């Protein structure tokens, strides 16, 4: 009985040892038996330990300085990747940019030897203190850019390259549209920290355009940055202002807006080359006037509604519309002159006959009406002379009867021909007058643009090419 009892105690003891051995089996062996998951590498353990040590007691709402009076210096730079759009109507400039910021965070320093030689870590920007630098002249309410990771070095240097899409306000000067040159600015600064707490240092005066994607309508002539200060009643705030000088590429508007307008302007002159008895003269002038109105509406949709400046092309269109309106009035007057006769109007004044039948035709290189009538009459007498003499000899009594009627008909025909010739003289006179006015008006309006391009845009473009 004693032997049997000792055997039972030995079995219980062996069973207890096996149970204890199974309960205290290593966790890694248990996981390996269940799923075969590997252990963390040494580098991952070091980085995990580094993050725990750095951010265990880190407060991202507090400025990372050793003393309260210390100033954080922010190195600030700007890189532009795309000039998306320039909205002249709403006076907005849309850009895709990268904000480059660098500062020292004294709370994020470590010894690389204590963490497996780790010198750089990537930290989300919403996990540490970042400067609240925003675009002041923002137009859509989005003052900040995207939230991305920062690069933190062992000495506490934090580098943050932040992509952003901005719509900034830009005062558009459309005086020389579409040959205009605009100067748009972007002003950055801290929203809450004054200059005694955060100082902004301009890293590079030139905007980085290494990854710039060209715009089909605008070309950046220059993009420069400058540092300034804005003050209020108690404090001063440092700010960085970038000025973008952009030039419009005018080829599209030249081909589809300016050239058609100039063509319509000179088409008005052609109206006076049509015969005065053609009713299509009024129709042509009216069609030109309607076309110019359509072009004016197109320009009104593009440019801002401002009374400070009037675009050059708008002035030219208004000038041409006045030009066409006057041509319609003159054409109506010429047609009225053409259809005059002795039965509808009084006799022609002597000064009208002298000026329009003798002097003006010579000045306009036209054949004189008196010369043409004399030649036609002379030829008629030569052709019908013998027959007329034979008729007079044979029917002298009949000639006396009809002479009064023939003379009257000749007088009526001469008056009608005189008025028609005056209408031709008026058409020729207005043809040269309107052609001269059209040329002078076109040159007078577009010469300032040519002068501006020759003295401003071309030298800047040559300077950029040499660089």
Swiss-Prot record:
Q: Which domain of life is it from?
A: Eukaryota
Q: Any S-S bridges, and between which cysteines?
A: 170-184, 234-235
The reply to whether Glycoprotein figures as a keyword in the UniProt entry is yes
Q: What membrane topology does this protein have?
A: Multi-pass membrane protein
Q: Which residues form the signal peptide?
A: 1-29
Where does the chain cross the membrane?
255-275, 284-304, 317-337, 430-450
- What does the activity regulation annotation say? Activated by a myriad of ligands such as acetylcholine, cytisine, nicotine, choline and epibatidine.
GO biological process terms, semicolon-separated: behavioral response to nicotine; presynaptic modulation of chemical synaptic transmission; response to nicotine
User: Which GO CC terms are listed, alphabetically?
Assistant: acetylcholine-gated channel complex; cation channel complex; cholinergic synapse; dopaminergic synapse; neurotransmitter receptor complex; postsynaptic membrane; presynapse
> Subcellular localization, per the record?
Synaptic cell membrane; Cell membrane
Q: What is this enzyme's catalytic activity, as reactions? A: K(+)(in) = K(+)(out); Na(+)(in) = Na(+)(out); Ca(2+)(in) = Ca(2+)(out)
Q: Which Pfam families match?
A: Neur_chan_LBD, Neur_chan_memb
Q: Which UniProt keywords apply?
A: Cell membrane, Disulfide bond, Glycoprotein, Ion channel, Ion transport, Ligand-gated ion channel, Membrane, Receptor, Signal, Synapse, Transmembrane, Transmembrane helix, Transport
Extracellular compartment spans: 451-467
Q: Which residues, renumbered to this chain, are glycosylated?
A: 155, 183, 229
Q: Subunit structure, per the record?
A: Neuronal AChR that forms heteropentamers composed of two different type of subunits: alpha and non-alpha (beta). CHRNA5/alpha-5 subunit is only able to form functional nAChRs when co-assembled with another alpha subunit, can be combined to CHRNA4/alpha-4 or CHRNA3/alpha-3 and CHRNB4/beta-4 or CHRNB2/beta-2 to give rise to functional receptors. Interacts with LYPD6.
Homology family: Belongs to the ligand-gated ion channel (TC 1.A.9) family. Acetylcholine receptor (TC 1.A.9.1) subfamily. Alpha-5/CHRNA5 sub-subfamily.
Protein's job: After binding acetylcholine, the AChR responds by an extensive change in conformation that affects all subunits and leads to opening of an ion-conducting channel across the plasma membrane. Component of neuronal acetylcholine receptors (nAChRs) that function as pentameric, ligand-gated cation channels with high calcium permeability among other activities. nAChRs are excitatory neurotrasnmitter receptors formed by a collection of nAChR subunits known to mediate synaptic transmission in the nervous system and the neuromuscular junction. Each nAchR subunit confers differential attributes to channel properties, including activation, deactivation and desensitization kinetics, pH sensitivity, cation permeability, and binding to allosteric modulators.
Name of this chain's protein? Neuronal acetylcholine receptor subunit alpha-5
Tell me the organism: Mus musculus (Mouse)
């Amino acid at each position: 009985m004693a032997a049997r009892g000792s055997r039972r105690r030995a079995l219980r003891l062996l069973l207890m040892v096996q149970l204890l051995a199974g309960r205290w089996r290593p966790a890694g062996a248990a996981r390996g038996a269940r799923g075969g998951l590997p252990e963390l590498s040494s580098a991952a353990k070091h980085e995990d330990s580094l993050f725990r040590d750095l951010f265990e007691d880190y407060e991202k709402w507090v400025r990372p300085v050793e003393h309260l009076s210390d100033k954080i210096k922010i190195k600030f730079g700007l890189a532009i990747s795309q000039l998306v759009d320039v909205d002249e109507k709403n006076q907005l400039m849309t850009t895709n940019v990268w904000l480059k910021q660098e500062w020292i965070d004294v709370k994020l320093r470590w010894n690389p030897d204590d963490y497996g030689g780790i010198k750089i870590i990537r930290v989300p920007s919403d996990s540490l203190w970042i400067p609240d630098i925003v675009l002041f002249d923002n137009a859509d309410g989005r003052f900040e850019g995207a939230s991305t990771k920062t690069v933190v070095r062992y000495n506490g240097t934090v580098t943050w390259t932040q992509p952003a899409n901005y719509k900034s306000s830009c005062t558009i000067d459309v005086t020389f549209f579409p040959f205009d040159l605009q100067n748009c600015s972007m002003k950055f600064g801290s929203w809450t920290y004054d200059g005694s707490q955060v100082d902004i240092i301009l890293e590079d005066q030139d905007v980085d355009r290494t990854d710039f994607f060209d715009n089909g309508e605008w070309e950046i002539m220059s993009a420069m940055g400058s540092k300034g200060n804005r003050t209020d009643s108690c404090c001063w705030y440092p700010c960085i202002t970038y000025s973008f000088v952009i030039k419009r590429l005018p080829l599209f508007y030249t081909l589809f807006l300016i050239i058609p307008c100039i063509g319509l302007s000179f088409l008005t002159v052609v109206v006076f080359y049509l015969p005065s008895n053609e009713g299509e003269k009024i129709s042509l002038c009216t069609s030109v006037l309607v076309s110019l109105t359509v072009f004016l509406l197109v320009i009104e949709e593009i440019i801002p509604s401002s009374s400070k400046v009037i675009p050059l092309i708008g002035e030219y269109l208004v000038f041409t519309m006045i030009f066409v309106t006057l041509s319609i009035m003159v054409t109506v007057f010429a047609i009225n002159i053409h259809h005059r006769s002795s039965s509808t109007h009084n006799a022609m004044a002597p000064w009208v006959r002298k000026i329009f039948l003798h002097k003006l035709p010579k000045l306009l290189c036209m054949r004189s009406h008196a010369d043409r009538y004399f030649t036609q009459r002379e030829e008629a007498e030569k052709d019908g002379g013998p027959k007329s003499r034979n008729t007079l000899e044979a029917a002298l009594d009949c000639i006396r009867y009809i002479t009064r009627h023939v003379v009257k008909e000749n007088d009526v025909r001469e008056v009608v021909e005189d008025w028609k010739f005056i209408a031709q003289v008026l058409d020729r006179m207005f043809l040269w007058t309107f052609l001269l006015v059209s040329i002078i008006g076109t040159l007078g309006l577009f010469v300032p643009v040519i002068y501006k391009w020759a003295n401003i845009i071309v030298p800047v473009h040559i300077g950029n090419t040499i660089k």
